[in-house]
Amino acid sequence: MIYSTTETIPGKEITEIVGVVTGNVVQAKHIGRDIMAGLKSIVGGEIRGYTEMLTEARDLAIQRLVASANEKGADAVVGIRFTTSAIMDGSSEIMAFGTAVKLKK
C-alpha cells in the first residue's frame, strides 16, 4: 500500500477515488510520564516519554488508516493529514485521514 501526504503519486495515475479513510487512537497519559513532564516543565527540554507516546500513537493511526483503505480495495491513500485533540483530562486523540484511491495497473 502506497500512502502519502501529497495529492498525487509520481509515476502513478489515479483512476478512481474510493473515499475518505481514517485511523485514530486515543492515548492516555501515564502517571510516571506526568511526573517527568512536571519536572521538565520547570527546567525545560524535551519530554521524551510524551514524544515516544505520540509517535507510537501516530504510527498506529497510520496502520489503522491503511487497514481501512485495504478493506475498501484501495491501492493507495493520498492527501494524508493528522489532527490531534483533547478528549478528556489526561488523554488525547490522534487521527490520520486521507483519500483512498485506485491506481492504473
UniProtKB/Swiss-Prot annotation:
Q: Which residues cross the membrane?
A: none
Q: Name one Pfam family in it.
A: YbjQ_1
Q: Which organism is it from?
A: Psychromonas ingrahamii (strain DSM 17664 / CCUG 51855 / 37)
Q: What is this protein called?
A: UPF0145 protein Ping_0381
UniProt superkingdom: Bacteria
Q: Which family does it belong to?
A: Belongs to the UPF0145 family.
HAMAP family xrefs: UPF0145 (MF_00338)
Give the source lineage, highest ranks first.
Answer: Bacteria, Pseudomonadati, Pseudomonadota, Gammaproteobacteria, Alteromonadales
Which InterPro entries does the entry mention?
A: UPF0145_dom_sf (IPR035439), UPF0145_YbjQ-like (IPR002765)
